[in-house]
Amino acid sequence: MGQAQSDENSIPTTTTTNTPPPSANSPRDSEDTSSPSMDSLLAEAAAYGEDDNENESLEAKAQRALDCPCIADLRNGSCGSQFSEAFLCFLKSTAEEKGSDCVNPFVALQSCINANPDAFSKSVTGDEKETEKKEEQPPVQDHRIIPPLWAKDPPRSGNSKL
């Protein structure tokens, strides 16, 4: 590879996408054709009805967030109880790093998702994007590299003093 090619390959390339943040106070638009991500669903549920009563207990806020219609499919699926437990634990978490005290419920949720791959839609779990990336990549071909003759060691004679 020449110096120009090497310099060209060392320049980092970045791709940015401008996606608007999810609306925190309104339910999802039913006309939206793209499936929302898990993060946007959870953010919407956490903010669901937040402006109604600021003096409400953490337990009541967490329960109201769980009642958000935006996560109804997640609650009612085959891993619904594990999702509800993990989500409530996260919302009620008072740890400095939010949710770090909720390892067990999230491990249970992950185990359930692994045991039931169809528990949530692929667009919610992010598997859809990984599948697309795998399909886009061309198959890797194995190549046999043969070194040039000048790079090979010369045959040794029995009279060599090396």
From Swiss-Prot:
UniProt subcellular location: Mitochondrion intermembrane space; Peroxisome matrix
Every CHCH domain range: 76-120
Top-rank lineage group of the source organism: Eukaryota
UniProt note: phenotype after gene disruption: No visible phenotype under normal growth conditions.
Low complexity biased stretches: 9-18
Disordered, as annotated region: 1-61, 119-162
Molecular function GO labels: protein-disulfide reductase activity
Matches recorded under InterPro entries: CHCH, CHCHD4
GO cellular component: mitochondrial intermembrane space; mitochondrion; peroxisomal matrix; peroxisome
Biased composition (Basic and acidic residues): 125-145
The keyword Amino-acid biosynthesis is assigned to this record: no
Function: Required for the import and folding of small cysteine-containing proteins in the mitochondrial intermembrane space. Involved in the mitochondrial oxidative folding of the copper-zinc superoxide dismutase CSD1, the copper chaperone for superoxide dismutase CCS, and subunits of the mitochondrial membrane respiratory chain NADH dehydrogenase (Complex I). Involved in the peroxisomal oxidative folding of the copper-zinc superoxide dismutase CSD3, and the fatty acid beta-oxidation multifunctional protein AIM1.
Protein name: Mitochondrial intermembrane space import and assembly protein 40 homolog
